[in-house]
């Protein structure tokens, strides 16, 4: 430390040197010292350093001065508080100096100090004291109005300080406001402008009294309207406040908007611009409060969008009618540009109107149909706007409209799910001709910006409405070619033109382009040869799509591709051979050439083997291998049967080696390639090649990656069918892995289906030691030997399915095996595991093979219903149902008879019936529907809820068989006097809803409202199941309930409230325990709310929704967890609405995070509280992603509370790490 002090005193001495270079070097060295973490200054050194740095602010040399100012940053954090106050005092005094240079350098110094202070959320006393010291000096400097340059600097620093440390200055806010308000009438516009910026930062952190004072002042001054100049300033100020604190100004809009509307009618273009900008900020920042005024705002914007008093557009309109595909004469281009009037401000009004319409369109999704009636035609008519900047904003507004129209989810464009009448998509479709007509002329404008806007517009239009331009291609192609050929086109314009062409090619049928191929190929080929890699890359993508157009393989085509093959091939091969090109170009050249060979390979002659050799080289390169594998897969699957023999000998072993690489996408791609090669080129593959692949397979068959396993099993199935002799090699490790996977509880879905296909293909190959009985023993052996216990029930189901698959493939073996399984069930010495497997296997076999010849089967299964093991009973129930499907006339009457005569076994028998209804064919079941229906209705009033649920599921699935007859019958039971019956039929409806179109859907849509009326049922349980059914509809088929939301939501929200009358105390020994009978129904209501965010967001009043979310944040553990999830979703979906409610949301979150569990609580309580804290923190992290959320005083206070609490800080940090790693994963496209 002594040496550091000595070194610094040495530097201080040099700073007094008369040589400016010495002073400069010494100051620079001091800067370096101050930036070291290790430096510690004693009191004396601190005083001397501070004094010297302040003295150097007045140095004669500018460079020394600047360095001295930079030293202030690190110095502030290295010296004691009173020294920082000395620095600030001196800088404030110097800021008022007569010397301009000293004033300037002191202002920079103050900004540097403020920038270095710890943030308000850290709770630092230093920051608070320094800011208080500066504030007093600044307010007096601003209020004096003596020297404008001092005022401007002071306002600048004030704004900076309020934005960084506003929360610390709450006590000064009234005096800051008092000094700022008079500056709004300053004769200098620059002063007014900076005052508005400072006020914008003030409103983010000031208390309500100050905020109300400011708004009242602005409203009263606007009402007086003393001078046009100040009125303009006040309107700008209101817009700035709205932008910074929209959530606070909302309640004053009823007073503000009529004034702003009035000023729009004043003949002053600047004022009009500011008024419309204010509307834009209200629309974006106060969505709820502005709602009643949106129509007025739209009308004003539409009026001023065309406001161009000094220019006549009439001649152009006539021009527009003469639209032709050749584009006419280009000599008249740019005539608009010749018109100029420097005093004309009307373009600013038009631009403000376009931006405001953009804001309205982007934020009011529910008004889309209205926008297509009024806003869309108006914007289209303004594509001809003469002022380029305004035109760009008009285009941007229309792009926003298209983006809002893009179907977000499949149900929006699913014809079954469409609401009746005109939809935004059909309205847009009808306006496409007008859009194309308006764009046609713009596409040959000189302006690059305008043409880029046209391409963006066409791209978005085709993404929203694929096929929309089918009739208009002849008109648009010349415009695209114009930009591709234009020497003056910028690179970005060419890229946009190519990208637009690509999207159009992808979304229209090939025939549409055939008349234009001759015109399109040359410019695209020229772009492939462009020296700029981004243009080449985009052009290769277009070329690949053009290849599919000139020779489509999936439909008959009479188009002659021959004239274009040479050009397309030559330009692509040149790029394919080049070694030093960009990675993107390399990959796209490979993909494009793959497409050329796939579609045109029979025309390439001697070029084909040479090109395939290049592919072989690319296969050996780590960077290009995955793209090459995909290209080879495409070629191998071509119906042209391309000759791949020249490369298979070397290529297949390379592909085999990829299966051991630690790159998942490469493994999956390689398995696809090998599969198609085996299917289409089996005669060209040798046993050695196949063995090389088989050697690599065992590690791929594993439960750790089911998708890779599925692909590997599918490959083996193909091999068994095409190359059965190779399977003798799999009896070792591959088969062990397969059998191991069958026992995995994770084997289901696609992987299980692949496994069943494989066993069926394998058993018929007749391979040694892999016959029916061999495989059966391998599959079932462990269960019989009891050597390895199968812990998971799913494993027994998988083995049973495999046994059934083998038996279906070898039906002659069936009777003996079925007989054996029946004996296993009967045998008193059989373990439960053996019985379980035998019953499930009987069920799976009987599902596909009629077992009615097995006379004792019924009695054996019924006997198993009495087993002490629940799993065996359940398996017997499943087996009976599944066997019945194999022969309905034999077994179904028997099951119905048993349900009637065996009340004790009813529950299990109903499960058998459910299996029959779920799995049997509609035709087979039709004759029995009436009998089953009558039986089920007898049991729908059963007091046992489990039985009622099975009955309801049976009723629902039965209704799907004959909806016209049965749905009205279900509806009739809604008026039953039994609440059990009502709950059964409402639950039954849940089982008629699925996520794909069904014949019942239109009928269901007409009557689901009647079922949902049970949300008003007096019985709590009926209301709960109504919510569960509603949730299922909202999740799987939102179109059923979208139009009912206005009626349903009040009842839904009603069920989110805690009901005191449903809370009771239960005595358990010496303890009293509180039971809340309303918890389940509240949970169901909140689950519905969560679902609606995904499926019906545009139909929700988000502020009403948030009211109930707020209540949920204070509810029971389960409900808090749900509402925390909702906050995370809402932060992304409607950030501006959440921002308005932020202060009300923070408190319950803080309460959750700071709750302490009693020391004597059980471990489960601690775990629950920990999970609650983590979920609450996730919600906080999501809220903080909303722009400007951290500016809320309550939120920043909560943040500082989190950072000062080690436990909370650790949780918060880990959550932020998790979310950032998740984002990275989602960006990883491999």
UniProtKB/Swiss-Prot annotation:
GO aspect biological process, one term: protein ubiquitination
Record keywords, A-Z: Acetylation, Cytoplasm, Nucleus, Phosphoprotein, Repeat, Ubl conjugation pathway
Positions annotated as HEAT repeat: 2-39, 44-81, 83-119, 131-165, 171-208, 210-247, 248-282, 289-366, 370-407, 424-467, 471-510, 515-552, 563-602, 606-643, 646-683, 688-725, 729-768, 770-808, 809-845, 852-889, 890-927, 928-960, 961-998, 1002-1039, 1043-1097, 1099-1133, 1140-1189
Oligomeric and partner information: Interacts with TBP. Part of a complex that contains CUL1 and RBX1. Interacts with unneddylated cullins: interacts with CUL1, CUL2, CUL3, CUL4A, CUL4B and CUL5. Does not bind neddylated CUL1. Interaction with cullins is abolished in presence of COMMD1, which antagonizes with CAND1 for interacting with cullins. Interacts with ERCC6. Interacts with DCUN1D1, DCUN1D2, DCUN1D3, DCUN1D4 and DCUN1D5; these interactions are bridged by cullins and strongly inhibits the neddylation of cullins.
Domain of life where this protein originates: Eukaryota
Pfam family name, one: TIP120
Entry keyword Calcium: no
InterPro entries: ARM-like (IPR011989), ARM-type_fold (IPR016024), CAND1/CAND2 (IPR039852), TATA-bd_TIP120 (IPR013932)
N6-acetyllysine PTM sites in chain numbering: 55, 971
Modified residues (Phosphoserine): 335, 558
GO CC terms, sorted: cullin-RING ubiquitin ligase complex; cytoplasm; nucleus
Protein name, per record: Cullin-associated NEDD8-dissociated protein 1
Lineage: Eukaryota, Metazoa, Chordata, Craniata, Vertebrata
């Amino acid at each position: 430390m002594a040496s550091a002090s000595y070194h610094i005193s040495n530097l201080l001495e040099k700073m007094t040197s008369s040589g400016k270079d010495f002073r400069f070097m010494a100051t620079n060295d001091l800067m370096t010292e101050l930036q070291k973490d290790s430096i510690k200054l004693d009191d004396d050194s601190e005083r001397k350093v501070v004094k010297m740095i302040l003295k150097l602010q007045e140095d004669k040399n500018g460079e020394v001065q600047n360095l001295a100012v930079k030293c202030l940053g690190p110095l502030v954090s290295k010296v004691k508080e009173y020294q920082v106050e000395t620095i600030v005092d001196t800088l404030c005094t110097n800021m008022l100096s007569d010397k301009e240079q000293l004033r300037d350098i002191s202002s920079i110094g103050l900004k540097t100090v403020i920038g270095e202070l710890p943030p308000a959320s850290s709770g630092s006393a230093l920051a608070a004291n320094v800011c208080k010291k500066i504030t007093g000096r600044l307010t007096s400097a601003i209020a004096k109005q003596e020297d404008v340059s001092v005022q401007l600097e002071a306002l600048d620093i004030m704004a900076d300080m309020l934005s960084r440390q506003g929360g610390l200055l709450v006590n000064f806010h009234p005096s800051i406001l008092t000094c700022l308000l008079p500056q709004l009438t300053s004769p200098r516009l620059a002063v007014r402008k900076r005052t508005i910026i400072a006020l914008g930062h003030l409103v983010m952190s000031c208390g309500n009294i100050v905020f109300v004072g400011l708004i009242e002042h602005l409203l009263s001054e606007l009402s007086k309207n003393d001078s046009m100049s100040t009125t303009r300033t006040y309107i700008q100020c209101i817009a700035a406040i709205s932008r910074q604190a929209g959530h606070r100004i909302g309640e004053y809009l009823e007073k503000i908007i009529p004034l702003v509307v009035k000023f729009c009618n004043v003949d002053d273009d600047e004022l009009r611009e500011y008024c419309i900008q204010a509307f834009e900020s209200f629309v974006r920042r106060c969505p709820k409060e502005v709602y009643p005024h949106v129509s007025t705002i739209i009308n004003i914007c539409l009026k001023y969008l065309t406001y161009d008093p000094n220019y006549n557009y009439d001649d152009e309109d006539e021009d527009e009618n003469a639209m032709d595909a050749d584009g006419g004469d280009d000599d008249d281009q740019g005539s608009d540009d010749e018109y100029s009037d420097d005093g004309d401000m009307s373009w600013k009004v038009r631009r403000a109107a376009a931006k405001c319409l953009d804001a309205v369109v982007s934020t009011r999704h529910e008004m889309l149909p209205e926008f297509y009636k009024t806003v869309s035609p108006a914007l289209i008519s303004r594509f001809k706007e003469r002022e380029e900047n305004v035109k760009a904003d008009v285009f941007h507004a229309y792009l926003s409209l298209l983006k809002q129209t893009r179907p977000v989810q499949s149900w929006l464009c699913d014809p079954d799910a469409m609401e009746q009448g005109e939809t935004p998509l059909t309205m847009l479709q009808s306006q496409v001709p007008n859009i194309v007509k308006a764009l046609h002329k713009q596409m040959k404008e000189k302006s690059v910006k305008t043409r880029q806007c046209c391409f963006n517009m066409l791209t978005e239009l085709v993404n929203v409405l694929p096929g929309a331009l089918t009739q208009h291609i002849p008109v648009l192609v010349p415009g695209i070619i114009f930009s591709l050929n234009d020497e003056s086109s910028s690179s970005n314009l060419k890229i946009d033109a190519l990208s637009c062409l690509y999207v159009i090619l992808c979304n229209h049928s090939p025939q549409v382009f055939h008349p234009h191929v001759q015109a399109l190929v040359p410019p695209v080929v020229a772009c492939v040869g462009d020296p700029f890699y981004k243009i080449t890359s985009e052009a290769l993508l277009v070329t690949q799509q053009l290849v599919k157009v000139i020779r489509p393989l999936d439909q008959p085509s009479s188009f002659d591709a021959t004239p274009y093959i040479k050009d397309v091939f030559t330009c692509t091969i040149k790029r394919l051979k080049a070694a030093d090109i960009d990675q993107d170009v390399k990959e796209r050249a490979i993909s494009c050439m793959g497409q050329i060979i796939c579609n045109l390979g029979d025309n390439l002659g001697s070029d084909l083997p040479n090109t395939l050799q290049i592919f072989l080289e690319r296969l050996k390169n780590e960077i290009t291998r995955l793209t090459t594998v995909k290209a080879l897969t495409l070629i191998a699957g071509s119906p042209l049967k391309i000759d791949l023999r020249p490369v298979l000998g070397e290529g297949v072993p390379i592909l085999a080696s990829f299966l051991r690489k630690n790159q998942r996408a490469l493994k999956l791609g390689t398995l696809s390639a090998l599969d198609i090669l085996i299917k289409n080129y089996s005669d060209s593959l040798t046993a050695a090649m196949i063995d090389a692949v088989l050697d690599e397979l065992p590690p791929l068959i594993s439960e750790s990656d089911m998708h890779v396993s599925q692909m590997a099993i599918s490959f083996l199935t193909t091999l068994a069918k095409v190359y059965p002799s190779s399977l003798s090699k799999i009896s070792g490790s591959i088969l062990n892995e397969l059998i191991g996977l069958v026992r995995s509880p994770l084997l289901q879905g696609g992987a299980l289906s692949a496994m069943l296909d494989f066993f069926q293909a394998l058993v018929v190959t007749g391979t040694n030691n892999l016959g029916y009985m061999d495989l059966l023993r391998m599959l079932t052996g462990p269960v019989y030997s009891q050597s390895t216990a199968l812990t998971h029930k799913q494993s027994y189901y998988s083995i049973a399915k495999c046994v059934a698959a083998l038996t279906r493939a070898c039906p002659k073996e069936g009777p003996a095996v079925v007989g054996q399984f029946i004996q296993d069930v009967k045998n008193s010495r059989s373990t439960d595991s053996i019985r379980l497997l035998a019953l499930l296997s009987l069920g799976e076999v009987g599902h596909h093979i009629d077992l009615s010849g097995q006379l004792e089967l019924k009695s054996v299964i019924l006997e198993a219903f009495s087993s002490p093991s629940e799993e065996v009973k359940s398996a017997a129930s499943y087996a009976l149902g599944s066997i019945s499907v194999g022969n309905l006339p034999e077994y179904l009457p028997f099951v119905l008879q048993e349900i009637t005569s065996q009340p004790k076994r009813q529950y299990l028998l109903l499960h058998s019936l459910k299996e029959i209804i779920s799995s049997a064919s509609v035709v087979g079941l039709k004759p029995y529907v009436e009998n089953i229906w009558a039986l089920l209705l007898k049991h729908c009033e059963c007091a046992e809820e489990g039985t009622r649920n099975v009955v309801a599921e049976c009723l629902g699935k039965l209704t799907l068989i004959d909806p016209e007859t049965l749905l009205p019958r279900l509806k009739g039971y809604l008026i039953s006097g039994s609440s059990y019956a009502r709950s059964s039929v409402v639950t039954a409806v849940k089982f008629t809803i699925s996520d794909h179109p069904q014949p019942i859907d239109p009928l269901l849509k007409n009557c689901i409202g009647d079922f949902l009326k049970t949300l008003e049922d007096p019985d709590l349980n009926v209301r709960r199941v109504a919510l569960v059914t509603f949730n299922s509809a909202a999740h799987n088929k939102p179109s059923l309930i979208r139009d009912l939301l206005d009626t349903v939501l009040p009842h839904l929200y009603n069920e989110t409230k805690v009901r005191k009358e449903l809370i009771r105390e239960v005595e358990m020994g010496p303890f009293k325990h509180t039971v809340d009978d309303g918890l389940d129904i509240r949970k169901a209501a909140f689950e519905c709310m969560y679902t609606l965010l995904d499926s019906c967001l545009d139909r929700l009043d988000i502020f009403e929704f948030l009211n109930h979310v707020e209540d949920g944040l204070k509810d029971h553990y389960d409900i808090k967890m749900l509402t925390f999830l909702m906050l995370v979703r809402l932060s992304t979906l409607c950030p501006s609405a959440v921002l308005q409610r932020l202060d009300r949301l923070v408190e319950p979150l803080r309460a959750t995070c700071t709750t302490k569990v009693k020391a004597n609580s059980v471990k489960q309580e601690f775990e629950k509280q920990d999970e609650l804290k983590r979920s609450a923190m996730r919600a906080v992290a999501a809220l903080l992603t909303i722009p400007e959320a951290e500016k809320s005083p309550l939120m920043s206070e909560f943040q500082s509370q989190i950072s000062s609490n080690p436990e909370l800080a650790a949780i918060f940090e880990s959550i932020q790490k998790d979310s950032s790693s998740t984002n990275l994963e989602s960006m990883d496209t491999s």
